[in-house]
Every structure is written in C-alpha cells, then in structure tokens.
Regions:
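Acidic, metal/ion-coordinating pockets
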Residues: 1-271, 306-314, 369
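Catalytic centers of hydrolytic enzymes
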Residues: 4, 8, 14, 23-27, ...
Length: 453
C-alpha cells in the first residue's frame, strides 16, 4: 500500500509540507511507537516525485531539539542536505540572534523566507515545479520577539503579503503559497469515541484575515498538532511537529480550481543513509541508558500519570522551593498523533529521552519568589486560561496548547516556585508584575532522574 494517497485527477503539482523538523535525523521513541524522521520525509518525497511533480515546503524550526545540546553546535549542515524547496523562518531560527542565523543560512541551498521581519532574509521565492512556477511567501511567528532573540515584526506586516503575492503572479507564478510559522489552538479530546485532538482557529484567523485572500494556500506550523481547515476561504493546514507527519496538498492544473488539502499522513521511521556527527550524537544518546521508570508518564490531559506533574515535583525537590510548576506546552517530545505531546515510557530511560524534555545544554530551573497567595492565584489563572472551554482565551498569543499545568506544592502557600527559565515571562504575565528569580545549582535532567528513583 502506498503511504500517501494518489493525487486527485487534474493535479498539476503535489505539495508536501512539514514543520518543526527539529533535526530529527534518526527515529525516536514515542507514546505510539517509533516516530518519523527527516529521512522518512525524503522517502515520501522521492516516491511522490516518481508519480507527479512534487515540492517540499517547511514552516521552520530546523535545529531546535536534542541534537544541538548533544553536539554542541547546531546541525545546519545536516538540515541543508534535505531536498526542501523553500521554508519560512521559525521562532527558534532566531535563538542565537540574527547575525548567527544569517551566517547559518549560508549553508542552506534552499531559501529561508521571512516577509514580516526586516532582518535580511528574503521575503519570497519562486520554486520551479516541472508544471509551472510556484510562488512562496514566508512569515515567521507573529510574536517571534517574545519567543527568541528576534526583533519585533514590522508594523502592519500583514499588508506586505498582497503586494508580494501580486508580484509573484506578475513574474509567472501559477500558484502562491504563504508559509506561516503559527498554528491553531488545540487540546486532547477526552471523548474515547472522538478524534485524538480538537482545535479552534480563531487566533490564527485573526492573524491571517488581512491577507489570506491574496494567496491560494496557507501552510502553518509551530504547534504539535496537525490540522486542516480554511481561513477567510483559503485552504490551510499544518503537519505535526518533529517529522511525525507530512501535510499533503494537491495543486490543480485548472486556474479557477482551488488547492485541495488531502490531510496529514504519518512519516515512516527511516534511518538516515549517511552517518554524520549529529546522527552519531543522537544514536549515542539513544543507547545511553541513564535510569529507569517504573511507569509510563504522559503529557495528556486526564492521564493517570501526568508527566508535567512529575517534572514539577522534580523541580521542586531539586531546588528546595515550596512548589514547582510546569506548562505542558514547554516540554514537547512528539507530535500529537494520539493526543500526547510528551512521553516518558516505562522501562529504561535514555539520555535522549531526557534531552527531548530539556533540549538545552544549560537545563537549570529558576526559582521565582512569590508573595502570599500568589501561587494559588497563578495556578488558578493559568487553569482558567488553558481551559479549552474558555473561548475568550483563544486569542492569548501563547495559549495554543490547552492543557493543565503540572503542579507540585509542599506547603499550602509556597513563597517560591521552581520553573524552567522560559516559563518566567508567562508567570509574570499571569501575575501582572515583574518577578525576581534565582538560578538553581542542579539541572532539570538530573532532577527528573532522581524523581524517578
């Protein structure tokens, strides 16, 4: 059986789209078995190119993930070897700052696009497909400056898309695609007879409304879930993160016909054809057993053993703080094919398992000082915001993963809470004040291992 459906009659070009590849150069363990890999996407692409013209578009975030802290350098060369045709810059592309990103792009043979940020990256590109030119516009995350070392997007950046699309069409583009590094708000579906996840697109629709009608297709990303829908009448979709799935779109040969998003499909767990330092580092970490878990822990709403709670307990005990708190969206190990965002499976725990949960060389948590009553306040406010039924919270920019926080408290009214440093701005927003923090002396990976024993 072919892993992807045959193209619809009248298809001129097929698009395969991915997001947040995160240097997944080798398959890794997930809650549902083996996850996909970059090499698996290449397998799908090569098979599709035997059947019809096919292009690969990506929504960015290439080198976030375990490979960077394991290797000590970002594996840009590995990602540059992938036969991608065009990509948008993700927020993690800016983690090391703009100069480092511009230097890194020198090894990429495909364009990394960013129309809504003035940093020296191209805004658009023309991709030759074998069936006519495809115009591509790249858009990074609208709040990239809050997520990385990037400047804010340009004022009124949505107004740039229309002129870019018209310019591409005037240059001969048969179709124009916008790649946006953002996705829907989603949450695990607790109905055993329903799909693994549910989603709403109000926040994404607000972002795309000024320009969605100017393009033929929107490819999204950034969030762990896969989704298909429409924005202002334009077909849109995004794959799951970490090469878990690929989004398939058929572009019609007839000019008046609309692109058809066929859906997302799992990526096979293919091993890379060539060993590189990054591949060797990932393989070594995957075979380096550092501990054992008696149970399977999942980041899944309602799970018997909720992984964010375990991490919160580990941070609290390691730091001596009165409490620990973990936002589920901040610790991703997989795409949500089964509704799970992170998993620590029963049995041997490897270095790679821990690196997926804390993919930084410096994994020290931070201790945040709290005033009386503030811990209960921040937990309650986060719960109200993350609640999937809270439609008035759909437009909170960081609220795309509607799952409960992991919480561990040693006292009724803790005077400090241990969190990972990147969570501090969210707590400050929820408490509406600046927060004083102190870095811990122990790392989160070591803390989690101790919590498992």
């Amino acid at each position: 059986m072919d892993p992807l459906p045959a193209a619809l009659p009248g298809t001129a070009v097929r698009v395969l789209a991915t997001t947040d590849l995160a240097a997944v150069l080798v398959p890794f363990r997930t809650s549902y078995g083996q996850g996909g890999s970059c090499a698996g996407v290449v397998d799908l692409l090569e098979a599709e190119r035997e059947r019809q013209p096919t292009v690969w578009l990506d929504a960015g975030d290439f080198t976030v993930g375990p490979a960077y802290p394991l290797l000590g350098t970002r594996p840009w060369a590995d990602m540059g070897e992938l036969p991608i045709d065009a990509a948008a810059a993700g927020n993690h592309e800016f983690d090391d700052g703009v100069p480092a990103l511009l230097e890194a792009t020198r090894v990429l043979p495909y364009p990394l696009l960013c129309a809504n940020l003035d940093v020296g990256l191209p805004a658009s590109a023309m991709v030759e497909t074998g069936a006519g030119p495809l115009g591509v516009i790249g858009l990074t995350h609208p709040h990239v400056h809050r997520l990385s070392k990037a400047p804010p997007p340009a004022d009124g950046w949505g107004g740039r898309v229309g002129p870019l699309a018209r310019a591409l069409r005037s240059q001969g583009a048969r179709w124009v695609v916008a790649i946006l590094h953002d996705g829907v708000d989603w949450w695990p579906d607790l109905d055993p007879n329903g799909p693994p996840t549910r989603a709403r697109a109000e926040r994404l629709a607000d972002t795309a409304r000024p320009w969605a009608g100017e393009v033929d297709l929107i490819v999204g990303g950034h969030v762990p879930d896969g989704w298909v829908g429409e924005l202002a009448g334009t077909p849109v979709g995004h794959a799951h993160v970490f090469a878990a799935s690929v989004l398939v779109i058929d572009l019609p040969s007839e000019g008046a016909a609309r692109p058809v998003v066929r859906g997302w499909f799992p990526v096979p767990p293919t091993r890379p054809a060539r060993r590189t330092p990054a591949v060797e580092a990932l393989d070594a970490a995957a075979t380096n057993v550092v501990g054992e878990s008696r149970h399977t822990w999942l980041s899944l709403t309602g799970a018997d053993r909720y992984l964010p709670d375990l991490i919160a307990e580990a941070l609290r005990e390691a730091t001596g703080a009165g409490a620990g708190m973990v936002l589920a969206a901040q610790h991703l190990t997989q795409g949500t094919l089964d509704g799970v965002t992170a998993a620590l499976r029963a049995g041997p725990v490897t270095e790679l398992d821990l690196m997926w949960l804390f993919a930084l060389a410096d994994d020290r948590p931070a201790t945040v000082e709290l005033r009386p009553g503030e811990f209960a306040t921040v937990v309650a406010r986060h719960a109200a915001t993350a609640d999937p039924t809270a439609r008035d919270a759909d437009r909170v920019w960081w609220n795309w993963s509607r799952m409960p926080a992991g919480v561990s408290a040693g006292t009724a009214d803790p005077d400090a809470v241990a969190v990972m440093p990147w969570v501090v701005p969210r707590l400050a927003e929820l408490l509406d004040r600046d927060l004083a923090t102190e870095p811990a002396t122990t790392g989160a990976r070591a803390a989690l291992l101790r919590a498992l024993t």
